[in-house]
């Protein structure tokens, strides 16, 4: 997968897979062993599919188009549910996201009469990568729905403001 000017390789951690496969045949266990690595950081790569065959279902799951379905960026966050998200992009930013969509599911659903904004829906897991992308657009894009994501963005922006005012770290990580 190509993301932010870097190629990534999707694979399975074999040594752990051998141990888990002996103890359990559940494909969900194997899914937890999937690793995504930046290609430019790999110093040695060995194809071992012949020694450690995966099921046809698992091979299909690991293709980039299936593995990254409904995902933004390189992380597939199983614990983050797929959501239908509605955003509003203001002029001239909407020209940019129409030329380079935020996600392949992006669809324009409304345009203001005065041409000042357009609204879009996306079906995606709202991962950290996705939130960072929305924040990168600053005040030019806002989340309308779901309300939980809108409130999360408001919380992030409030924490950012307070961090700038106080010089303290308020990222929620200890």
Predicted regions and their residues:
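Residue-identity detector for glutamine
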Residues: 5, 106-107, 132, 151
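Well-ordered beta-strand positions
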Residues: 1-2, 110, 135
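Surface-exposed, charged, gly/pro-rich loop-and-adjacent secondary-structure segments at domain edges
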Residues: 10-129
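Structural motif
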Residues: 6, 41-43, 140
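Generic C-terminus detector
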Residues: 122-174
């Amino acid at each position: 997968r190509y993301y932010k000017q870097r190629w990534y390789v999707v694979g399975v951690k074999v040594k752990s897979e051998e141990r888990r496969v002996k103890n359990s045949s559940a494909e969900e266990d194997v899914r937890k062993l999937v690793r995504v690595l930046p290609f430019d950081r790999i110093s040695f790569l060995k194809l071992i599919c012949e020694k450690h065959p995966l099921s046809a279902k698992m091979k299909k799951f690991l293709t980039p188009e299936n593995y990254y379905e409904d995902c933004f960026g390189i992380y597939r966050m199983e614990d983050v549910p797929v959501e239908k998200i509605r955003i509003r992009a203001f002029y001239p930013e909407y020209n940019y996201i129409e030329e380079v969509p935020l996600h392949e599911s992006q669809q324009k659903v409304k345009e203001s009469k005065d041409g000042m904004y357009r609204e879009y829906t996306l079906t995606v897991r709202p991962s950290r990568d996705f939130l960072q992308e929305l924040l990168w657009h600053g005040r030019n894009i806002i989340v309308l729905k779901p309300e939980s994501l809108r409130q999360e963005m408001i919380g992030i922006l409030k924490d950012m403001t307070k961090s700038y005012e106080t010089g303290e770290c308020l990222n929620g990580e200890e």
